Design a protein with these regions (language model features):
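Juxtamembrane intracellular "pre-TM" segments in multi-pass secondary transporters
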Residues: 1-15, 205-241, 420
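Helix-loop boundary and gating motifs at the non-cytosolic
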Residues: 5-67, 237-277
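Hydrophobic core of transmembrane alpha-helices in multi-pass small-molecule transporters
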Residues: 26, 110-127, 326-340
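Helix-to-loop junctions at the C-terminal end of transmembrane segments
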Residues: 68-81, 171, 288-300, 384
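C-terminal ends and interior cores of transmembrane alpha-helices
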Residues: 91-108, 310-323
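Intracellular juxtamembrane helix-capping segments at the cytosolic ends
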Residues: 127-140, 340-353
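Transmembrane alpha-helix termini and helix-breaking/packing motifs in multi-pass membrane transporters
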Residues: 162-179, 375-391
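C-terminal membrane-cytosol helix-exit motif in multi-pass small-molecule transporters
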Residues: 188-209, 402-411
């Protein structure tokens, strides 16, 4: 078989809904990372320097709202289908970026309050996330889940990094405030294009019951009840995997909320060079995504899951007292952490959880994970104000319980025993 035939066979599942989602992610991932290098500095300039817990409060509000909508999101995705949530909420997410554009003009209160409002609206729109992940699992065959997941993460890494570079150049060229406004205008337009493209999605869950918006509120108690009950019927491994996933989200939040400020104020990295720290992640994600996906499919899911926390600890050690170059390596390693842990976790969950329960499981993981992420951001911001290095050392300390759980509590089913 020639190279072309091999590629066609290996990626034959890239079609339909999966292909539509990939194209939309290319647009959205390029856009969403554009403001990342200078987001912390933007909030700082809009009044965050006067109120030093602004970043932590915005981060907590972001993930608290995401947690609030995660459970009904999973329930509604399983009950009524995926598409009806994904498409409208992608349009609404695009509109939320308008708050980020006009924030510098806001005079009634501190300008960063408008960032807070836009963030809350954006977080509510992410009620569609469980539907999104469930649609991916519905659309990728069992034997290709590792590669399918890795392609998603490769897209995140590949198109994130050009976004950070272009966003960084705009900010350096136009100045912090005008540059970030230009960046958020581009983000708004690209999200609008992605939402329009997602109109092509086809529903994967057939349900003839009419959808009513009152279910957003009336279904909440039922959603909580069903989301709790589903944990009684899934294998115990899924519960331990859940603990590892939410611990990972918490540990990453501890440092993500202050890493740019830490690099500027503690390590002395010049603000106009900070965006360069994200460049090596591009090469890393492109090179590593496919091999890690094949590793998950061929070698198994537990080994890459165990490698992830060790890479995380290494990344933190490189960041704590590093320079621009060691920070580049550190951020590239964080990309590997996502590849190892998310690819293996998604594949393991897909082969152990029935399709009709995947939305609820994802919603449950997101619910607890988002609360812990918000708490991690507040705690990370607080610890930074006490002693700047504390968030990094706490992250390293939490690697040990994660490793113990993965090694001794998570079991991987044999291929012949996988039902889904």
């Amino acid at each position: 078989m020639g190279l072309t035939g091999l590629i066609q066979r290996e990626f034959s599942f890239v079609r339909g809904n999966y292909l539509t989602l990939i194209v939309s992610w290319v647009l959205m991932d390029f856009a969403v990372e554009m403001p990342v290098p200078y987001y912390q500095q933007y909030v700082d300039a809009l009044g965050g320097n006067v109120f030093p817990m602004a970043l932590g409060i915005i981060g907590f509000a972001n993930f608290f709202v995401m947690a609030f909508v995660a459970v009904p999101g999973g329930f509604l995705a399983d009950k009524f289908g995926r598409r009806w949530l994904i498409v409208p909420m992608t349009f609404a997410t695009a509109l939320s970026y308008l708050f980020f554009i006009v924030a510098p003009f806001w005079q009634l209160t501190a300008s960063w309050h408008l960032i807070l409002i836009g963030t809350i609206l954006q977080s509510f729109c992410l009620i569609y996330q469980p539907a999104l992940f469930a649609m991916v699992q519905d659309s990728v065959p069992q034997e290709s889940r590792g590669v399918g997941s890795s392609i998603i993460h490769m897209i995140h890494g590949t198109f994130n990094t050009p976004g950070t570079i272009i966003g960084g150049i705009l900010v350096v060229t136009l100045g912090l405030i005008a540059g970030m406004q230009a960046v958020y205008l581009i983000v708004f337009l690209l999200f609008l294009a992605a939402a329009t493209w997602r109109l092509k999605l086809k529903e994967t869950i057939v349900n003839h019951e009419k959808i009513r918006f009152r279910y957003f509120l009336s279904s909440y108690s039922q959603a909580i009840r069903e989301s709790l009950n589903v944990w009684k019927i899934v294998p115990r491994t899924i519960l331990w995997l859940f603990i590892v996933q939410v611990l990972t989200m918490f540990t990453l939040a501890l440092t993500n909320v202050i890493n740019a400020i830490y690099a500027r104020d503690i390590l002395g990295v010049p603000q106009d060079q900070w965006y360069l720290a994200y460049v090596p992640m591009l090469v890393t994600m492109i090179i590593a995504s496919y091999p890690i996906g094949k590793m998950v499919d061929k070698v198994g899911m537990k080994l890459p899951l165990a490698i992830g926390p060790m890479v995380l600890a290494t990344s933190m050690f490189l960041f704590i007292s590093g320079n621009l170059y060691s920070i580049m390596v550190s951020i590239a390693l964080l990309g590997l952490v996502h590849l190892f842990m998310m690819s293996s976790a998604m594949a393991l969950s897909a082969c152990l959880v029935e399709p009709q329960n995947r939305g609820k499981i994802t919603g449950g993981v997101n619910f607890v994970g988002y609360i812990l992420t918000g708490a991690g951001m507040v705690l990370g911001n607080l610890l930074y104000n006490i002693a700047s290095y504390l968030p990094f050392y706490l992250t390293i300390a939490l690697v040990f319980p994660m490793m113990l759980i993965i090694i001794f509590r998570i079991s991987e089913p044999k291929k012949e025993d996988r039902k889904y």
